[in-house]
Amino acid sequence: MSTEAKCPFNHAAGSGTSNRDWWPHQLNLGILRQHSSLADPMDKGFNYAEEFKSLDLAAVKHDLAALMTVSQDWWPADFGHYGGLFIRMAWHAAGTYRTGDGRGGAGSGQQRFAPLNSWPDNVNLDKARRLLWPIKQKYGKKISWADLIVLTGNVALESMGFKTFGFGGGREDVWEPDQDVYWGSETTWLADKRYSGVRDLENPLAAVQMGLIYVNPEGPNGNPDPAKAAVDIRETFARMAMNDEETVALIAGGHTFGKTHGAGPASHVGPEPEAAGIEEQGLGWRSSFGSGKGSDAITSGLEVIWTSTPTKWSNNFFWNLFGYEWELTKSPAGAHQWKPNGDAGANSIPDPYDPSRRRGPTMLTTDLSLRVDPAYEKISRRFHENPDQFADAFARAWFKLTHRDMGPRSRYLGPEVPAEELIWQDPIPAVDHVLIDEQDVAALKGKILATGVPVSQLVSTAWASASTFRGSDKRGGANGARIRLAPQKDWEVNQPAVLAQVLETLEGIRNEFNSSQSGGKKVSLADLIVLAGCAGIEQAAKKGGHDVKVPFTPGRMDATQEQTDVESFSVMEPIADGFRNYLKGTYAVTAETLLVDKAQLLTLTVPEVTALVGGMRVLNANFGQTQHGVFTDRPETLTNDFFVNVLDMGTEWKPTADNKDLFEGYDRATGKLKWTGTRVDLIFGSNSELRAVAEVYGCADAKEKFVQDFVAAWNKVMNLDRFEAANR
């Protein structure tokens, strides 16, 4: 018998066929458990914001600036300057952001982990992060990898003569890959199963192929057609919240510096970091072409240098773009790229490693899109003729690119946060009045309940306001009271007619209260909306025999329509909200999957989701006042009836004939119809994990626990966006 056969540990714990292998369509609740304290190596009570505030940012930037021009033999710097490499690193960290669900981006240092660390578009960025290790090692916990990656991009630009718009710190690292981000369903790199129809890109994706940040630089699927490439550019950049001017500025600004790498065939390049041998120590793409580095480096397979000043800010990109007519050629690796007709400008570009050699300018297919596309060309020519406008546009677009997923300005830390307030930051006025106290809160609750507005409407309005929050990009939430503004006031899920009546009632209470105060005391509508929900829950709990006080912290303010970018908020309109039993249409994914997706964006745990759904149902807070899932004979009373009845074996459930998402529950003894429910309702009895939690709340001794857990989860959602309160 071999030694291997005798070993009792041929297969390690956690290996073998998984539940997901057996049941690939099983509801994935794991995304509600990611990034727990069990994965976090930092001490309990570690406060990254406080650590960053104690950081000598100027010293870090000084060290980064010095790093730029100290070329390392193990990965030499092009042109003696790492600026281009570090700009690409920061860009590709931030550029994964997409507006559809707010996921991706540079906010948590995900570029360190799979799959991003091994994407084809991120080839050799592992070297960039290794170059940064001595600086990360020096400053330790005072600066996260997430902040360091973005800051390094800024310093790279500044070290090459560009004036950046600013920098805000505060990106806290996570310690494992995100499990919630849908990067596509393709199983091979650079596949594009994500398209349907005539180039219709699947939502929420914002890249044309698996493993790319945005577009294929050779053109759609490698077709070197600048006009068709422009279509892809416009769509993908728009899904990252960039308009045409910002898009042109980013492409031209980024391609003012550095070069691409395609010294030889891709067949020489070894496996990516996640597939490389352990001896590679987390690095990948070892190349057997020549030295495998420097002038022999292979990254994208393209060998392009755009400008005559690749380590200095200039307007040379546009001079070259419009100064030559371009013809198609191929890189040494065989990739499509462009050179001037007749090899014009043959000696205008420096060689990255040999000062005695010169090259001609080269461009990517996607660069020529800025000249071929009529809208892009108009902007490009304006930037060409007005370098100051170009510099300002690039500075602003770069700042937006690298900060778009950070949420409101109140989260930005450090001395370089720009004073200017930008519309994409979803600005909210600072508190300018004395806040209401406990006595005022009690009086206002009484006035709200005295109006006779049903508990269900008070609760659903507060939920509609707060549940827009996305933990992904920290947008949305009750602060700002944007539920009263376009576009949210008109979203179908918010039942505009009912919403308008509730808001009118609350506005009357606010106006009466504010006009009767002295000393500058006021209540905002944003606060009053949340307080109304709290009052409704307290009344519903009291009806159920529970005297509970729902926590409330004032200090929210009301944003104006002018502070609200309608287009930017439109992408946040829910297609589903399982907490309100709302489903806008028919989708490829199940309603319960959309519930979990919504819950993850709300940073909820499995018990919190369970408590909230059960509570919202008995509070009668469904969209359209449907009775699906309202498993109680005493609606608007906060009880555990939902769980008691969804777990009741006296009910037999059957799908309805005309709706796969709707079910009818019949009394097993009498055959009479008792309840109707959706997939979101029945999943709490069907899914083994959710049923286990539902059983806790369905027990006879769990009535008080359920109320307390519901209130705690409710309070969490109401305050998810209160970053300004945390920083007071």
From Swiss-Prot:
The gene is katG2. Heme b binds at H255. CDD domains: catalase_peroxidase_1, catalase_peroxidase_2. GO terms for molecular function: catalase activity; heme binding; metal ion binding. The record marks R88 as: Transition state stabilizer. This is Catalase-peroxidase 2. Residues 338-362 are annotated as: Disordered. HAMAP family: Catal_peroxid (MF_01961). It holds the Pfam family peroxidase.
